[in-house]
Amino acid sequence: MINYLKGKTTQILKTPSNRNILILEVNHIGYEIQIPSRLARNLSLEEDQIVQIFTHLQIREDQQILYGFSTDSERDLFRQLININGVGTQTAIALIDTLGIEALINAIVTNDVKTLSKTPGVGPKTAERIALELKSKLSQWEQAIALKTPVSVGVPSREILEEVEMTLLALGYTDEEIDQAISAISQDNLLLKNPHVEEWLKSAIAWLS
């Protein structure tokens, strides 16, 4: 079993089905790894940068798929999610992408079905099942995960959010799409340090594309 891979990011591709594929070169071998959008946005293609990706290997009859995450906690939460009936790998990644690990764990532990249902493809029944099956498990190791997860550095200002919302509405996006995009990019600690609305708008459009 591969726990993690450490190497150079050579390519980040987007498939026709909107999945993010990282090509990670390790000892002259290029590994194809599907990663969450939030991780793809934070990776650099600089030649001298070495990154560590925590992996999960899915073996099927016709193929083997590697999924990659920025921390082992994120990877472990992904594994917990895909063990739930009706939650596949893409839904698990969408949950992590839409909410971020801290908000996702909190929503599960507090049985916040409304927040869980913000994720594309997750209806109220699936959200209830996730909370029911994982609430007690996550409560036991929530503190340990929080210690290993980078702490958020703040929240975006109301002025930034309002301008981003107005611009996205003018571009034709729906309220639901805008809420999901803002929820997702607000988990980006690097972006939270940035006071320029242009960068927030660029990140939101990239997430929506």
Swiss-Prot record:
Show the segment(s) annotated as Domain I: 1-70
Q: Which Pfam families match?
A: HHH_5, RuvA_C, RuvA_N
An MF annotation (GO) of this entry: four-way junction DNA binding
Chain positions covered by the region annotation Domain II: 71-149
The segment annotated Domain III runs over 160-209
Any GO CC annotation of this UniProt entry: Holliday junction helicase complex
Q: Where is this region: Flexible linker?
A: 150-160
Q: Where are the transmembrane segments?
A: none
Ordered alphabetically, the record's keywords are: Cytoplasm, DNA damage, DNA recombination, DNA repair, DNA-binding
- Keyword Cytoplasm found: yes
Name the family the entry cites: Belongs to the RuvA family.
Q: How does it assemble?
A: Homotetramer. Forms an RuvA(8)-RuvB(12)-Holliday junction (HJ) complex. HJ DNA is sandwiched between 2 RuvA tetramers; dsDNA enters through RuvA and exits via RuvB. An RuvB hexamer assembles on each DNA strand where it exits the tetramer. Each RuvB hexamer is contacted by two RuvA subunits (via domain III) on 2 adjacent RuvB subunits; this complex drives branch migration. In the full resolvosome a probable DNA-RuvA(4)-RuvB(12)-RuvC(2) complex forms which resolves the HJ.
Record function comment: The RuvA-RuvB-RuvC complex processes Holliday junction (HJ) DNA during genetic recombination and DNA repair, while the RuvA-RuvB complex plays an important role in the rescue of blocked DNA replication forks via replication fork reversal (RFR). RuvA specifically binds to HJ cruciform DNA, conferring on it an open structure. The RuvB hexamer acts as an ATP-dependent pump, pulling dsDNA into and through the RuvAB complex. HJ branch migration allows RuvC to scan DNA until it finds its consensus sequence, where it cleaves and resolves the cruciform DNA.
What's the protein called, per UniProt?
A: Holliday junction branch migration complex subunit RuvA
